Structures are given as C-alpha cells and as structure tokens.
C-alpha cells in the first residue's frame, strides 16, 4: 500500500539523435551493429516465467538486406509452451496486481531510462540488422518512440487514477482501477520495435499479465526488449514471450477461460479472424475480453490546387518510401490536381531517382530491404501487374532484386483508373500510385478518397487555402483516424498525435494516449456510508 500521493515525472518526447558524421552516437551504433552482425551464434530463447526456454526447433535469423548471412537462431515452441506461458502469467498475476501503481510505474520509467542510455545503441542496432531500418528510422522507433510510450503511459496511468467521483454528505465515493481478471494476449508486428514493446507494456503497466507472441521477423529486437524489462526489475511471469505459429498459440489462448484481452497490431484479415474466434468461444470466458487492434491502411495524400509543390513532393517521398513503405501509415495513393502535376511529377521523379538503396550500415542509404521473401514476392507481383496494365505508367522505379537482399526500388506509378488495384489494396511496400484529377473535380475527388478503400488509418491534405483545409477536414472526417494538414501521413508522436483508425483499420483505441490505457483497466466503484441507516422504513411510509 502506498504511503503518499505521488506525481509521475512529467514526460517530454525523447530528443532524436542526429547520427551526423563525427557524432558519438554514430560511432557507437555502428560499432554495436558490426559487433552484433559478426556474433553469428546468438540463440534467442522464449521467456516463460523466470526461465529461458530453448527447443530443438531452431529458426535462423538473417538481415533482410543480406539474407545469406545468419545472425543466429531463435527457438520455436508449440502448444505446451503457450500453456506454460499462460500458467506463468496467471501465477505472477496476484503479486503484480497487488503492487502499488507507482511501483509498477517505476519499473517502466527505469526501462525508459535504460533505453535512453546504455541500451540505446543495442536496440537500434538490433532493429537495423533484423528489420532493415536505416539508423534514423531505428532511432525514431526503437529508441525514441519506445521511450515515449513508457514515460507517457506512466503519466497517463496517474491521470486515470486521479479520476474520482463526487461524494455527498455522509458518503465517500471512490474508484480503484484494477487489471483485467485473467491474462492479456499480445500479438505484435515486425515493423515497429516500439509497438511490439508497447502492446505488452501498456496493459502490464495497468496491472495485467501478458502472453506475448512477437512476429518471427522481429524476434531479434524482441530479445533486447526482454533484456531491458528484466534489467528494469520487471518480475518474472508478468510478460512471457513465446515464439510459435499463430494458429497454434490462438488455439490455446482463445479457448482458455482466463483469456481477458487481445492487444493486436497486424493485418486486417488476421484481426477479423481472431475476433471471430473469440466470438465463437465467448461462453468459455470468465469475463468479456477486451479487444484492441490496429490493422491495415491504404493511406492517402490529397493535394489541392493551392498546395505548395515542394511540400507535396517532400510529403510523398517521405510518406511513401521511408522504411520501404512498410508502415501502416505509409502514403500509398495520391490525388494530384492537373494544374500542379507537371511540376510535381518533375520534382518527384528527380527525388525518387536520388534515393540510395542498400544496407543500413551505409548511412547514405534512404531505403533498405523489405522484411522477407514473402513480402518481396508479394510486392513484385504488384510491380508486374503495374508494368502489364494499360491503365498505368510507371514513372520511377519498378524493379526488384532479391539476389543478396530483398530490395525493391521506390516506385511511382500514374493511373488513369482511380479504383485500380494499387489504389485500393494495401501493398506494404515502396509503391505509390498517383491519380491526376481535373482541378474542378475537387469535391468528387474527396468522395473518391473516402470511398475507394476499406481502411481509414491516415491521410493528408496539402493546401494553402484555409477554406479548403477546413472543408476537407470536415468532409474526410471518417476517412482517417490520423489526419495531417500539409504534412506526410506518417510519424505520429506519442502524446502529440494519438495513433489509430477505424473502419477496416482497427478499433481506434489510440496508442500513445490515455484512451489506450483505459482499455486495460477494470474499474471498481466503492461507496462508503459513514453513518448507515438502522431501519428499513422510508419517510413516505409514515
């Protein structure tokens, strides 16, 4: 029990280091990258309770940009490991739930400071190696965003605990905020180290225990996350990491009566399937599970005739091609007015041709490799379709090569059909499709933006006319959960732009805000009457 009312240190966003030539952080991360690259024998275990669990099934880990090189192996589990992880979580739950909220906060605040200091180079290097992010993309993800999640979430937790009801004379009303009764299942993606950690840490902070299944292609940095949490003092069993096939884990988790919540980032199809499975088993559960998910996107950039050409071009290049377009928020469809297209096309093509591609070890590279062969083959299929289409002209890029790494050129295609395949479907790669519209058709184009895709994650409007900005913001109110004015549709900062979308893009529970943490607590109202009545009768009965 706490003996005081405590104030969490007020969070500010972690400054992004520059990694410019001559800076100490540049030398440190390069040294760590090369050290980890040449380790070769790393063996990533599963973390179940206080045990590092290894199996006979060893899966190789290789850099996407150098897929013949083996960084090491991770251990693949099965049904028994998932069951053991659930048992370990439930065993840890009573003590973790009873720990005062400020003590839980202290653990994750320490983890943030460890990431900001001694673990910064390691988690960035791991993300560069195994997820093929350039150093800037690794820094804003694995270091800064993760640090921000941990610090801001502690602040948001205090905000939640401060929400208390009014009391009348003779009565004291109060609210307490409990973890969910059972365990939370976290299924996390490859593309953001920070998201993978936060999907575990956010519910854990609120007093929950976690079974975590990371993406196979993110296990390398997932191990560093577990190292950080352990160094910060997280008790054994609070977060349990298992690596196995998704259906294997799901078959155990979704039939367990103590399943209390799903925290998910991944594809829309998988999320819908999981929701269906939970629905089928709803009668098995002790409580109705909380379901929180952020899924796909087909994110747009809409330029108005009043837009600045250079701002649009920069927004398109950064929004579409940073991290090879493998962000849920990446710009993948653009609508450009005829009056600006000639100038935008010239500068856009020139910029894309300037982009260097290769290993993240070479800091001049803007783009590196896509995550794995399956992703490469899928994207290459879209490129083939674009090249063969009578409705499309590829004006930049269009080639791919997987001989050494899974490299796909940043590609810009122009279509005459605004509902063509690459304007509708999520590609998750460095492919931008542009539709050029008559200036007079802006109203119709907004309808097109709103109805073309099943998703509603991010979008951007570029315009100088304030009336246009106001009108587009209102007209496209449900087209994107994160809407950007004169900026690229990526790069949401924790505490500044809470992230998430609706429609086919998820439950819009806004990671990076207090809204997400509310989903991971079960409130209890306590009413205390100081002088209770001593007879059942009411005055009207006299």
Predicted regions and their residues:
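Short beta-alpha connecting loops at secondary-structure transitions
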Residues: 133-134, 210-213, 237, 257, ...
């Amino acid at each position: 029990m706490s003996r005081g009312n405590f104030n969490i240190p007020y969070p500010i966003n972690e400054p992004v280091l520059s990694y410019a030539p001559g800076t100490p952080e540049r030398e440190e991360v390069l040294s760590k990258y090369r050290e980890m690259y040449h380790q070769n024998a790393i063996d990533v275990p599963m973390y179940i309770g206080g045990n590092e669990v290894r199996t006979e099934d060893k899966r190789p880990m290789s850099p996407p940009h150098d897929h013949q090189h083996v960084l090491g192996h991770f251990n693949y589990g099965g049904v028994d490991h998932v069951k053991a992880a659930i048992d370990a979580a439930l065993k840890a739950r009573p003590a973790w739930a009873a720990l005062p909220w400020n003590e839980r906060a202290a653990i994750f605040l320490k983890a943030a400071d460890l990431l900001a200091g001694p673990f910064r180079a390691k988690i960035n290097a791991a993300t560069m190696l195994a997820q093929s992010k350039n150093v800037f993309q690794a820094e804003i993800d694995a270091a800064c965003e993760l640090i921000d999640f941990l610090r801001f979430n502690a602040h948001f937790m205090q905000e939640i605990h401060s929400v208390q009801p009014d009391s009348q004379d003779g009565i004291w009303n109060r609210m307490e905020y409990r973890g969910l009764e059972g365990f939370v299942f976290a299924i996390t993606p490859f593309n953001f180290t920070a998201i993978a950690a936060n999907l575990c840490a956010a519910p854990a902070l609120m007093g929950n225990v976690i079974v975590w299944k990371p993406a196979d292609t993110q296990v390398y940095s997932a191990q560093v996350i577990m190292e950080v949490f352990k160094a910060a003092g997280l008790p054994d069993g609070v977060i349990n990491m298992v690596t196995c096939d998704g259906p294997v884990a799901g078959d155990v988790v979704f039939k367990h009566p103590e399943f209390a919540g799903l925290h998910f980032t991944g594809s829309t199809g998988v999320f819908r399937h999981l929701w269906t499975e939970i629905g089928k088993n709803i009668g098995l559960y002790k409580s109705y599970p909380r379901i929180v998910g952020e899924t796909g996107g087909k994110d747009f950039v809409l330029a108005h005739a009043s837009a600045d050409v250079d701002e649009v071009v920069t927004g398109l290049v950064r929004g579409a091609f940073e991290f090879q377009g493998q962000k849920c928020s990446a710009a993948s469809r653009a609508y450009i007015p005829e009056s600006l297209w000639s100038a935008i096309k010239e500068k856009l093509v020139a910029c894309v041709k300037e982009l260097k591609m290769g290993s993240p070890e070479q800091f001049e590279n803007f783009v590196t490799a896509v995550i794995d062969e399956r992703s490469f083959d899928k994207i290459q299929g879209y490129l083939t379709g674009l090249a063969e289409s009578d409705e499309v002209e590829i004006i930049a890029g269009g080639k791919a090569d997987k001989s050494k790494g899974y490299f796909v050129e940043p590609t810009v295609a122009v279509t005459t059909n605004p509902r063509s395949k690459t304007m509708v479907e999520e590609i998750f790669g460095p492919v931008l499709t542009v539709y050029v519209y008559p200036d007079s058709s802006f109203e119709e184009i907004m309808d097109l933006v709103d109805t073309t895709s099943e998703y509603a994650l991010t979008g951007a409007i570029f315009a100088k006319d304030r009336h246009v900005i106001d009108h587009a913001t209102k007209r496209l109110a449900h087209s994107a959960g994160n809407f950007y004015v004169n900026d690229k549709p990526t790069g949401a900062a924790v505490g500044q732009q809470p992230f998430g979308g609706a429609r086919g893009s998820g439950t819009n529970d806004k990671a990076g805000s207090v809204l997400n943490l509310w989903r991971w607590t079960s409130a209890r109202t306590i009413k205390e009457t100081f002088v209770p009545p001593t007879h059942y009768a009411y005055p009207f009965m006299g």
